Swiss-Prot record:
Keyword tags: Cell inner membrane, Cell membrane, Membrane, Multifunctional enzyme, NAD, Quinone, Translocase, Transport, Ubiquinone
Family: In the N-terminal section; belongs to the complex I 30 kDa subunit family.
Native source organism of the sequence: Blochmanniella floridana
InterPro entries referenced in this protein's UniProt entry, alphabetically: NADH_DH_suC, NADH_DH_suCD, NADH_Q_OxRdtase_suD, NADH_quin_OxRdtase_su_C/D-like, NADH_UbQ_OxRdtase_30kDa_su, NADH_UbQ_OxRdtase_49kDa_CS, NDH1_su_D/H, NiFe-Hase_large
Statement: the UniProt record of this protein carries the keyword Disulfide bond: no
Residue span of region NADH dehydrogenase I subunit D: 210-596
Principal subcellular localization: membrane
Subcellular location: Cell inner membrane
Lineage: Bacteria, Pseudomonadati, Pseudomonadota, Gammaproteobacteria, Enterobacterales
SUPFAM superfamilies from the UniProt entry: HydB/Nqo4-like (SSF56762), Nqo5-like (SSF143243)
Documented EC number(s): 7.1.1.-
Function, in words: NDH-1 shuttles electrons from NADH, via FMN and iron-sulfur (Fe-S) centers, to quinones in the respiratory chain. The immediate electron acceptor for the enzyme in this species is believed to be ubiquinone. Couples the redox reaction to proton translocation (for every two electrons transferred, four hydrogen ions are translocated across the cytoplasmic membrane), and thus conserves the redox energy in a proton gradient.
Molecular function GO terms recorded: NAD binding; NADH dehydrogenase (ubiquinone) activity; NADH:ubiquinone reductase (non-electrogenic) activity; quinone binding
Name by which UniProt lists this protein: NADH-quinone oxidoreductase subunit C/D
Length: 596
C-alpha cells in the first residue's frame, strides 16, 4: 500500500526549480527577475510587465514546456503590511502556468502601480487567458492592452466599481448609499441582456442568408444551471456561440476576506455544491501549510474516505443526468437511490449530507462513529453491481453511442490550450491526476489506477472515464476500510481550530486560546500558500495570502468548470443543436463552480 510518490515529487521540484531558473537568467539575465519564497511547490518570479510576453513564449517553447495557463488573477497589495523583500506594487497580476511533462509549475507575478494599471494581454500565447483577464479587469480594474473583448464577464454590465479592491464593501450593509434594486435598475439590467451580435464580432447575415440567434438558457434544463449560450445558427448548424456566465456569482472570494480562517470552511462546500468535503480539502490544506500544522494519519485517511464518497456521489449524478439529456431516462431514478445510500454513510459520520463542513484546520471535526465500517461496507458491496448496470444500459447502448462517439471531441493540444483538467484531459491520453502526480493528504499510500483515454476526448470517452473513476474510488474506500489507522483526529498544534476541548477544560491558557480561536479566529503567520487537489470536475485550488491576521488577505479560488465552459465555442462550431446538448452533458459542470 505504501509508495514514495510524494517524496519523489518533492525532490523533483527542487531539481526543476533550479533548471528553469538557470534557463531564464541565461536567456533574460537576472537584474529584473526577483525570486519569491512561499508555501508553494512552484518557482515564483516577479517580472516587469514589459517582459511578460517574451518570458511566457520562452517557457512555452523550452524542453518539457509549460503548455497550460492554469490560472490568472489579481491581488490588491495596497493594504498589505508584510511585503518584505517584494517589489513595490499597488496591484499584482498573477500567472500560473503548468508543465505536465515536468510535473512542475511556474508562477509569474507582475507588479503594477496605481497610476499605470495596465499590462499586455497574453491571449496571443494562451487562448484561455481571455476569460481570466476579463475577470481580473472587472474585479480589480487592471487593463489588459490589446485584449480582443475586455468586457464584464461575471458581474452585470451596469455594475459599478471593482469588487475585489480593498476599498470595496464586503457586505451589502456597508454600501453608502445603501444598495437597493429599484425597478429602474432592474429594467436597465434586463436591457443589458439583449444580445447584440456586433459586440461579439458576429454578423447578422451573409450574402446568402440571415442568421438566427437563439438563446439557450438561462432557464433551459440542458444547460445545467443558470447559464445562457447565445447560438448563431444557419438552420440547425451552429456557426458560432457565446457562453454567458455570472448568474450564479455570490462573491465567494470576497467573502474569504471577511470571514475568519475557521468560519470560511462552510463556504467552501458551496463553491461546487456537489463535491462536499472535496471542496474543503484544498482550503484546509492551504491554511495548514501557512500555520505549519502536521495532521494526524487518522485524520488524513478520514478526509480521503469522505472525499472519495463525494467523488462517487458526484459522478453518479453526472452519469445519470447526462444520460437523461440524451434520452436515457431510467438511470436518473436509480442513481438517486444509490446516492442516498452514500449520503447515509456521510450523514452517519458528519451529521450532514450535502454540505458537511466537516474538515477542520488541523484535522476533522470528530472521530468516526462506532458503526461506520458496517455502513461503509454495505455501501461498497452494493455499488459495483449498480455501476455495472449503468455500463450495460449506457455504454453498450447503440443509440447512445451514435449520439456521443466523435461528438464534442478534441485532442491533447487543444485540451492543454484551454486549461482542461480532470477526465476531459485524461480522455486525450494524458495521464495527469494530482492524487498520483502530486499526492496530498496521504494519497501516496493508496493503490489505485488512473483511467486514461485513447487520445480523443469526446462525449462517449469522457463518460467511460467517469465510470472507471468510480471503480477506482471504490478501491480507495476499501483500503480505508481495511487500513484505518488509530490515533487522534486533530492535531495538538496551537493553531488547530477549534482546539481540542479536553485541554480547554483543564488549563486556563488553553481555555483562553479556545475562546479566541472560536470567536475571532486563529492568527495565521504571514505568507502565501497554494493547494491544488483533484476534485470531481477537474483541478480545484485555493491560493491564500495571510497578512498575520485572523482573516485571509486574499482568497483566490480556481475552479475547473470556468475554463471548461470557455472552451465550448471552439469545440461545438459546425455541430448541430442536439450535439451541443450531448456535449454540455458530457462536460460535468455546475454553475456555482463556474461563477463562485
Amino acid at each position: 500500500m505504501m509508495n514514495d510518490n510524494k517524496y519523489i515529487h518533492i525532490d523533483s521540484c527542487v531539481i526543476e526549480k533550479h533548471k528553469i531558473w538557470d534557463s531564464l537568467i541565461t536567456k533574460f539575465g537576472s537584474h529584473d527577475l526577483i525570486l519569491q519564497s512561499a508555501y508553494i511547490d512552484s518557482l515564483i518570479i516577479w517580472i516587469p510587465k514589459e517582459r511578460i510576453i517574451p518570458i511566457m513564449e520562452f517557457l512555452k517553447q523550452i524542453l518539457a514546456p509549460h503548455v497550460m495557463l492554469y490560472d490568472l488573477h489579481g491581488i490588491d497589495e495596497r493594504l498589505r503590511m508584510y511585503r518584505k523583500e517584494l517589489p513595490e506594487a499597488d496591484f499584482t497580476v498573477f500567472y500560473h502556468i503548468m508543465s505536465m511533462s515536468r510535473n512542475y509549475d511556474v508562477i509569474l507575478k507582475v507588479p503594477l502601480l496605481e497610476n499605470a494599471m495596465n499590462v499586455t494581454t497574453i491571449t496571443s500565447v494562451f487562448m484561455n487567458a481571455n476569460w481570466y483577464e476579463r475577470e481580473t479587469w472587472e474585479m480589480f480594474g487592471i487593463h489588459f492592452d490589446y485584449h480582443p473583448n475586455l468586457t464584464r464577464i461575471i458581474m452585470p454590465k451596469c455594475w459599478k466599481g471593482f469588487p475585489l479592491r480593498k476599498e470595496y464593501p464586503a457586505r451589502a450593509t456597508e454600501f453608502y448609499p445603501a444598495f437597493t434594486l429599484t425597478r429602474k435598475k432592474e429594467d436597465l439590467a434586463m436591457d443589458d441582456l439583449l444580445f447584440k451580435p456586433e459586440e461579439w464580432g458576429m454578423h447578422r447575415n451573409n450574402k446568402h442568408e440571415d442568421f438566427m440567434f437563439l438563446n439557450l438558457g438561462p432557464n433551459h434544463p440542458s444547460v445545467h444551471g443558470v447559464f445562457r449560450i447565445i447560438l448563431q445558427l444557419s438552420g440547425e448548424e451552429i456557426i458560432d456561440c457565446v457562453p454567458d456566465i455570472g448568474y450564479h456569482h455570490r462573491g465567494a472570494e470576497k467573502m474569504g476576506e471577511r470571514q475568519s480562517w475557521h468560519s470560511y470552511i462552510p463556504y467552501t462546500d458551496r463553491v461546487e455544491y456537489l463535491g462536499g468535503c472535496i471542496n474543503e480539502m484544498p482550503y484546509v490544506l492551504a491554511v495548514e501549510k501557512l500555520a505549519g500544522i502536521v495532521v494526524p494519519d487518522r485524520a488524513k485517511i478520514i478526509r480521503i474516505m469522505l472525499s472519495e464518497l463525494f467523488r462517487i456521489n458526484s459522478h453518479l449524478l453526472y452519469v445519470s443526468t447526462y444520460l437523461q439529456d440524451v434520452g436515457v431516462m431510467t438511470p436518473v431514478f436509480l442513481a438517486f437511490t444509490d446516492r442516498q445510500k452514500i449520503y447515509d454513510v456521510i450523514e452517519s459520520i458528519t451529521g450532514a449530507r450535502m454540505h458537511p463542513a466537516w474538515f477542520r484546520i488541523g484535522g476533522v471535526a470528530d472521530d468516526l462513529p462506532l458503526n461506520w465500517s458496517d455502513l461503509l461496507k454495505q455501501c461498497l458491496d452494493w455499488l459495483p453491481k449498480r455501476i455495472a448496470f449503468y455500463i450495460d444500459i449506457a455504454l453498450k447502448n447503440s443509440i447512445f453511442k451514435k449520439r456521443t462517439c466523435g461528438i464534442g471531441s478534441y485532442g491533447a493540444k487543444e485540451a492543454l490550450s484551454w486549461g482542461v483538467t480532470g477526465s476531459g484531459l485524461r480522455a486525450t491520453g494524458i495521464e495527469f491526476d494530482l492524487r498520483k502526480s502530486r499526492p496530498y493528504s496521504g494519497y501516496e499510500n493508496f493503490d489505485f489506477d488512473i483511467p486514461i483515454g485513447n487520445g480523443l476526448s469526446d462525449c462517449y470517452n469522457r463518460l467511460v472515464l467517469k465510470i472507471e473513476e468510480m471503480y477506482q474510488s471504490i478501491r480507495i474506500l476499501n483500503q480505508c476500510l481495511k487500513n484505518m489507522p488509530t490515533g487522534p483526529v486533530k492535531s495538538d498544534h496551537p493553531l488547530t481550530t477549534p482546539p481540542m476541548k479536553k485541554y480547554a477544560l483543564k488549563h486556563i491558557e488553553t481555555l483562553i486560546t479556545h475562546f479566541l480561536q472560536v470567536s475571532w479566529g486563529p492568527v495565521i503567520p504571514p505568507n502565501e500558500s497554494l493547494q491544488m487537489v483533484e476534485a470531481t470536475k477537474g483541478i480545484n485550488s485555493y491560493y491564500l495570502i495571510s497578512d498575520g491576521n485572523t482573516m485571509s488577505y486574499r482568497t483566490r479560488i480556481r475552479t475547473p468548470s470556468f475554463p471548461h465552459l470557455q472552451q465550448i465555442p471552439s469545440v461545438i462550431r459546425g455541430s448541430l443543436i442536439p450535439d451541443l446538448i450531448a456535449y454540455l452533458g458530457s462536460i460535468d459542470f455546475v454553475m456555482s463552480d463556474v461563477d463562485r
